[in-house]
């Protein structure tokens, strides 16, 4: 969904058509129009994803230029196909910076990707979802819980344990966590906790043991030497709902990131 190409969104899980024209009034601010649309999406049980939030090249100024309330977001697109094959990895990097800011402020918003095909390769990148059963309902519910990861290098081998218990990305943990991730390519694997890189490993796998305390989250990503992103595994976390958000709207994130 887009009003005028100054912000693109995906809505997941809609069971009925939304008549956008009935919600939007002529001359009103776009933020108000979006608020009413988002309220309707949530009312009927849908989820909201913000797509390519910083993709603002001269040819494709498609990043979000409206100051929406962050509380509406369920997902943030961190890899999008216009950045494939070495094209503009800068924009994906900025999206990941936004993801970390959101989590540091207690927002449980998960990373997703989109091939967003407009003449490019479909399926680059892909979302991989851990399912207990194959059904539309289960896919949506599991997606919403963040039990998924984004990859450009195919399926990853994941093994997460919290105090001996098997867990998955997107789950609540406490204390010691053992993590093993293996991919098909040699990359730079980074362990990120509360917006800080705490461990880096080069190769086709990472094996690490960490502690996740209250109000902390931990995630893993993989890049090449040019900092192009090839995999993003959603966070595990401990009581981040106890964090009092210091930011409430999109421009607070956008302005801080563009200043850097």
Task: Enumerate the predicted regions with their spans.
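Short, solvent-exposed loop/turn segments at secondary-structure junctions
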Residues: 56-59, 85, 200
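Alpha-helical scaffolding within the catalytic cores
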Residues: 54-66, 97
